[in-house]
Design a protein with these regions (language model features):
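Conserved acetyl-CoA-binding loop-helix of GNAT-fold acetyltransferases
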Residues: 102-115, 138-142
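Acetyl-CoA-dependent GNAT
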Residues: 8-14, 22-31, 38-99, 110-112, ...
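Extreme N-terminal starter segment of soluble prokaryotic enzymes
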Residues: 2-5
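Amphipathic alpha-helical recognition patches that constitute DNA-binding helices
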Residues: 16, 90, 104, 108, ...
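Short coil/turn segments at alpha/beta junctions that flank glycine-rich nucleotide-binding fingerprints
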Residues: 103, 120-123
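Active-site acidic-Proline motif in GNAT/NAT acetyltransferases
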Residues: 97-99, 103, 131-132
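C-terminal "cap" of GNAT-fold acetyltransferases
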Residues: 85-89, 123-126, 130-137, 141-169
Length: 169
């Protein structure tokens, strides 16, 4: 694989980010999240949300051959995961172009985020994954995470169980 570049997101990246997110959901969550939800994901709605995220810290992309092939959102606080005590940072989202999975892109994005947190002296990172998403759970376990909690994830008025992976940095 040619050289992968990890960099901060630009406004021009957002349509590619949204495309990866929507197709990622449809590929990874089929059989986990109801089909009617997956089949009606609104890219414009997702784009508006990503535009709001754009100015925040912790929004990176993986670029290969001048094309966005993955992205991450992360925060160096515990505002999103107050149900787990002692957390001081969180990986909010990690997505890879579905046709390019198992090429090390997710690992490089993950490690970039961990290095960022370590440089800020963060100690305990959490990320949430749908409980029935076995491939992602396997990846997050391989990356050193331990399941420490469970909560419900709400989408379009329906609830799905998520598990929280803890990483001691």
């Amino acid at each position: 694989m040619e050289e992968l570049i990890i960099r901060n997101v630009t406004f021009q990246d957002l349509p590619q980010v949204v495309d990866i997110q929507v197709r990622g959901w449809q590929a990874a969550y089929r059989g986990i999240i109801d089909d009617d939800i997956l089949d009606t994901l609104d890219k414009n709605e997702k784009l508006e949300k990503r535009k709001k995220d754009f100015d925040s810290n912790g929004f990176i992309v993986a670029e290969l051959k001048n094309k966005v092939v993955g992205f991450c959102r992360y925060v160096d606080n515990d505002k999103h995961s107050i149900i787990v005590p002692g957390i001081d940072c969180e990986l909010l989202a990690l997505y890879v172009e579905p046709t390019l999975k198992h090429n090390g892109i997710g690992t490089k994005l993950f490690n970039y985020v961990v290095d960022e947190f370590k440089s800020k002296n963060k100690k305990s990172m959490i990320l949430w994954c749908l409980k029935d998403n076995e491939p992602s759970k396997k990846f997050y376990t391989k990356m050193g995470g331990t399941i420490v909690s469970q909560k419900m994830f709400e989408v379009k008025g329906r609830s799905y169980p998520e598990v929280g992976f803890l990483y001691e940095l």
